[in-house]
Amino acid sequence: MDNFKHLPEPFRIRVIEPVKRTTREYREEAILKAGMNPFLLDSEDVFIDLLTDSGTGAITQDMQAAMFRGDEAYSGSRSYHALANAVKDIFGYEFTIPTHQGRGAEQIYIPVLIKKREIEKGLDRSKMVALSNYFFDTTQGHTQINCCVAKNVYTEEAFDTGVKADFKGNFDLEKLEEAILEAGPANVPYIVSTITCNSAGGQPVSLANLKAVYEIAKRYDIPVIMDSARFAENAYFIQQREKDYQNWSIEEITRESYKYADGLAMSAKKDAMVQMGGLLCFKDESFLDVYTECRTLCVVQEGFPTYGGLEGGAMERLAVGLYDGMRQDWLAYRINQVEYLVNGLESIGVVCQQAGGHAAFVDAGKLLPHIPADQFPAHALACELYKVAGIRAVEIGSLLLGRDPATGKQHPCPAELLRLTIPRATYTQTHMDFIIEAFGKVKANAANVKGLEFTYEPQVLRHFTARLKEIDA
C-alpha cells in the first residue's frame, strides 16, 4: 500500500451502534439539567462522544474470541497466568497484579510506597512530595488523599501551543532534581513517568528522557512507576521521532522503555483496548516486598490477587489486547487520525496543541480570551460544543487541576485546553470532518460564550461530579 495519499482504516467494521440525533433546544435543556457538566450527560443524548478513549472503543476479533477461554476460578486462574506471561513477555516484569482499572492500581501502590519510604528512609509525612512529568487526575487524587503533595516538573514548551517539539511530554530534568533536593530525597516516596503525557496534550516522552529520569531516581534511591495507559502510542512516537530507535520495532522499544522504571501502573482501557481492566506490575525481586504488600491490599480493595476485580475472560482479553495495541499499522492509523483532526481545526483558525497520541487539544484560552481561568474557559467551550453539535468533550485545565488542599486556592494552570479524545476504531474520517465543521460554528459565536461558576464543588476530583451555572454579564 505504498504511494497512496490517503489510506483507509486498517480494519473492517462488523458491528454498529445506532445513535440518536437531537435538536439544539433538546441539547440546551440536557446540559442545563446536567449542571453544565458534560460528565453528567446521559450517553444516549450524545451524538459524538469524545469524553475519553478509556474503555470506549472497539475491540479486535481476537480479543473477543479470547473471552471464551476465561477460567473463572477464584484463585490460581489459568487466565491470570496468561496475563502475567504477556506482561513478562512485553515489559519484562516478573510480578503482576490485575486490577479493575488504573485507579485500582493507584489506590494500592501509593500507600505502600509511602509506608516503605517512611520505614526505610525516615520519610516525614508532613513534608512528602511525589513528582511527575504530569500526574493524571486520579494519580494526583490518590497522591493527595494520602496527604502527599503532587508536583509536576514539565518542560517550558509543554503547554505552549505555539511551539512544536518532538517530545513535549518530557520531564524537565533540572527541575526534577531541584524538586528532589528541595523536599529532601527521603521525603519523595515515588516518581511517576506518565507516557504519553495526557494532560500536556497526549505528548510523548523520549526514551533518552525516561533513562535520564531513572538515573536521577536511582541516585537518590527513589522508586519510579511508569503510568502506562498509552505505552504503545509513546513507543510509536519514539520510533518515528527519536533517531536511535527508528529501526526498532514497537515491541523492542516498549521492552527498552520499561528498563527505566521499577513498576508500572496501567489503565488497560486505553492502549490495551479493553473496556475494563488495569495492571500493577513490578520488575524484579528488588521490589518483592512492595509486591507482597500490594497483594495483601489487593485482597481488601480489588479482590484476590489472581483476579483483582476482573473475570477470567476479561484477563484473557487483556492479555491479547496488550499485543494487538502494539500493531504498527494500527498505531500509524490512530496517530494520523488525530493529526488529521488537529490540522483541520487549525485550518479554520482554531489553535491546538501539537497533535499527540489520543486526542486533539484545543487551546480554549485563545478561542475564548474573554473568559478568565477561574471561570473555566475550556469547560465553557465543552458546553458550547455540546449545544451546537451534540459533541461531548472534556476540559483539561483549571477545573481539572483543582485547588491546593492546604490553602484552598485554585492551582495555577499552565493552559486551558479542551480535549477531543478519539475512541479506538469507533469514528471515521467523516466524523472528524463533522467535528471540524462544528468548531467553525462555535468559533463564529465564541464572543457570546459565558464563563461558569460552581453551584456544587466536590473536594476531590471535582471535575467529574461538579455542577455549575453560566455567569451572566
From Swiss-Prot:
Pfam families: Beta_elim_lyase. Pathway: Amino-acid degradation; L-tryptophan degradation via pyruvate pathway; indole and pyruvate from L-tryptophan: step 1/1. It comes from the Bacteria. Coiled coil: none annotated. Keywords: Lyase, Pyridoxal phosphate, Tryptophan catabolism. Its cofactor is pyridoxal 5'-phosphate. GO terms for molecular function: tryptophanase activity. InterPro entries: ArAA_b-elim_lyase/Thr_aldolase, Beta-eliminating_lyase, PyrdxlP-dep_Trfase, PyrdxlP-dep_Trfase_major, PyrdxlP-dep_Trfase_small, TNase, Tryptophanase_CS. It is an enzyme of class 4 (lyase). Its EC number is 4.1.99.1. The modification N6-(pyridoxal phosphate)lysine is found at residue 270. It catalyses: L-tryptophan + H2O = indole + pyruvate + NH4(+). Belongs to the beta-eliminating lyase family. PANTHER family: BETA-ELIMINATING LYASE-LIKE PROTEIN-RELATED (PTHR32325), TRYPTOPHANASE (PTHR32325:SF4). Homotetramer. This is Tryptophanase. It comes from Vibrio vulnificus (strain YJ016).
